[in-house]
Amino acid sequence: MPQSSRYSDQRVEQLLSELVNVLESQHAPTDLSLMVLGNMVTNLINTSVAPTQRSMIARSFADALQASIREDKAH
């Protein structure tokens, strides 16, 4: 079931496009991009989420990420 969001699809897509543009302009390979994005998520959780909620938020994020990965062989 799709998750509802308080943010518009347009806002999400615009931010995603800007982040992708930064990574592409830096010619960042996939492994570096994943490392940087992972560090960004960690930083956001550690600086913006109450300590008592961090583990739950990280687990929820990881579960959502895993659920969004396609299992087809194309990439």
UniProtKB/Swiss-Prot annotation:
Disulfide bonds: none annotated. It comes from the Bacteria. Pfam families: DUF1414. Coiled coil: none annotated. Belongs to the UPF0352 family. This is UPF0352 protein NT01EI_2610.
